[in-house]
Amino acid sequence: IKLEHGKALKAEHLAPYEGQGYTAFLVNKHETSTGVHYDMNLISDFCKRNQLFLIVDCISTFLADPFDMKELGADIMITGSQKALACPPGISVMVLSPKAINRVNNTKCVCQYFDLKIALKNMERGQTPWTPAVGILRQINARLKEIDANGGVEGEIARIGALATYFRDKIKGLPFEIVSESLSNAVTPLHPTTASAYDIFLKIKDEYGMWICPNGGDMKDTIFRVGHIGALTTADYDMLIAAFWELKTKKFI
């Protein structure tokens, strides 16, 4: 299902696929390039009506936005060590429902690269099939303890949400448009109305020593993103916003 940049998923987008014999629905809960956070209740209801196996890529929204796998009837959730876990990339995390585990264990498909059946069997003895990135696993362990000590999952979602709200309130008056119709807490996607998005990214990086997120392809000059996950504070946003205002004063934006 292809949507225009920044557009939310709606019932009319799903209607043509109703009752068409599909067996699974794969969705990235948050489309990171344009900052669109998809309506998982809409998708869940569609999958339940059509008896679809629901696989959700939560990599950029995990711990940033609410997600109740059981309530939504999701069968597989995928995330990673980067993004809101704020660890180096290198560990993929998959959570399987009982239905998904049963499906894996009963599949006749021969896997040559990534066999979840082997992973599940090794999990019974607390192991992985092959040596994982042990250093990153230890970092994830420490990070989860930190999250647990600071209000748990709900506390982390609230913290990230508060940072997103703070930033979005503070940029009012700058020549930027928020392009997403359905925002995630994880990131704010901005379209500069007076300058190239990529030129702004370079200027902020080279002259102010700060990194915002550029885009590629046909969005290179139209959209950049500012993240709200990881070890960020309101002081970081104050510095970035001051840089934006300085660029406006200099008529760069």
Feature map (PLM): residue ranges:
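Active-site phosphate-binding strand-loop segment of PLP-dependent enzymes
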Residues: 9-63
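Active-site C-terminal subdomain of aminotransferase-like
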Residues: 82-166
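Hydrophobic beta-strand scaffold residues
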Residues: 3, 54-55, 178, 212
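Conserved active-site segment immediately N-terminal to the catalytic lysine
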Residues: 70-82
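PLP-dependent enzyme catalytic core of the Aspartate aminotransferase-like
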Residues: 218, 222-253
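Conserved PLP-binding catalytic core of the aspartate aminotransferase-like
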Residues: 176-207
